[in-house]
Amino acid sequence: MLKNLFRKTKYITVSQKNIENYKRENTPTIPDGMWVKCNKCGEILYQNDLEKNYMVCNLCGNHFRIGAKERIKYLFDKDTFKEWDYKVKTENPLNFKGYDEKIENIKEETNLSEAVTTGKGKIAGMEVVVCIMDSKFMMGSMGSVVGEKITRAIERAIELRMPVIIFTVSGGARMQEGILSLMQMAKVSSALAKLDEEGLLYICVLTDPTTGGVTASFAMLGDIILAEPDALIGFAGKRVIEQTINEKLPEDFQKSEFLLEHGFIDKIVPRSDLRKVLAKLINMHKNSF
C-alpha cells in the first residue's frame, strides 16, 4: 500500500496548440461585418438594420459615410440608373512617384474607376443627370478625370434638357496632379455657367466631408444647396484658420448646421428624406426642362 502511495501520478500533457484549437472549435464565430460601432455615440448596430435605415444610426442620428453605389440604391427608381464614362482612365501627367500603383490598388480595393460616378436615372419617374463623389477613392480628391467626368455629365444634361444633381464629398484637389487638378475647378464651374444660361436646374448635396477646391468651386454654385446633418463643409481646416487669425472658432464651425444658420446653404435634409425632397424640387422646376 505504501508502494502505491508514492507511485508517479499519470497525467496527460496538453500543448498550447491543442488549447488554441479547442477554443477555436468551441467558440461561437460571428461573421465579419455583421455588427458596426457608431463612431458618434458608440452604440453597436446590426449591419442589416443599419442598411435598412439608410446607414443612419437609429440612436443618435449619425450619418455614416456611404459610397456611390449605396447612394444610387437609395436615390433612384429601381434599375433606372445608367452609368456614363466609366472607361475614362486616370493618367499620371506629372510622373508622380507611386501614383500609378496607388490608383490601380484603389481600383481593385473599391471596384471603382475613379472618385466620381456619373450617369442618368429616374427619381419618382423624372429623369435627372447625377454626379456622385465617393470618399473611398482617394478621399474623393478631384483630379483631371473627376473634373472631366463631371463636365461631360453637365454638357450631356444641357443636350438632354435635364436637371443636374451633384453629391459632393472630397478632401480637395488631388496633389499628385498639381495644377491640372486645380484647373478642374474652373472647368466644372464654366460648364455649370452654361447650364445656368440654359435655364436648367442644378442641385448640390453636400455630404461629409466637403472641403478644399470642391467647396471653392462647384459645391457652392448650386441653384439649391442641400446638406446632410452634421456634415463637415469648408475650405481650409479649422486649426489652420485658428492659427491664421489667432482666434478660437465656435465648436460647430464648418458643420452643416452652422452653415445653414449663416445662410451658406438652403436646407439640411436627413438621408431618409432626401429622395422625397429631391423629387419635390425637380417637380417644382420641371417646366424649365
Swiss-Prot record:
Ribonucleoprotein is among the record's keywords: no
Domain of life, source organism: Bacteria
Biological process according to GO: fatty acid biosynthetic process; malonyl-CoA biosynthetic process
A GO-annotated cellular component: acetyl-CoA carboxylase complex
Key words of the record: ATP-binding, Cytoplasm, Fatty acid biosynthesis, Fatty acid metabolism, Lipid biosynthesis, Lipid metabolism, Metal-binding, Nucleotide-binding, Transferase, Zinc, Zinc-finger
Top EC class for this record: transferase
Domain CoA carboxyltransferase N-terminal: from-to ranges: 34-289
Positions annotated to bind Zn(2+): 38, 41, 57, 60
Protein's cellular compartments: Cytoplasm
Annotated metabolic or biological route of this protein: Lipid metabolism; malonyl-CoA biosynthesis; malonyl-CoA from acetyl-CoA: step 1/1
EC number from the UniProt entry: 2.1.3.15
Cofactors that this protein relies on: Zn(2+)
Cofactor note: Binds 1 zinc ion per subunit.
InterPro entries, per database record: AcCoA_carboxyl_beta, Acetyl_CoA_COase_Trfase_b_su, ClpP/crotonase-like_dom_sf, COA_CT_N, Znf-ACC
Catalytic activity: N(6)-carboxybiotinyl-L-lysyl-[protein] + acetyl-CoA = N(6)-biotinyl-L-lysyl-[protein] + malonyl-CoA
Example of a GO MF term: zinc ion binding
ZnF start-end (C4-type): 38-60
Statement: the UniProt record of this protein carries the keyword Cytoplasm: yes
Family, as annotated: Belongs to the AccD/PCCB family.
Function per UniProt: Component of the acetyl coenzyme A carboxylase (ACC) complex. Biotin carboxylase (BC) catalyzes the carboxylation of biotin on its carrier protein (BCCP) and then the CO(2) group is transferred by the transcarboxylase to acetyl-CoA to form malonyl-CoA.
Oligomeric and partner information: Acetyl-CoA carboxylase is a heterohexamer composed of biotin carboxyl carrier protein (AccB), biotin carboxylase (AccC) and two subunits each of ACCase subunit alpha (AccA) and ACCase subunit beta (AccD).
Protein name: Acetyl-coenzyme A carboxylase carboxyl transferase subunit beta
Organism: Clostridium botulinum (strain 657 / Type Ba4)
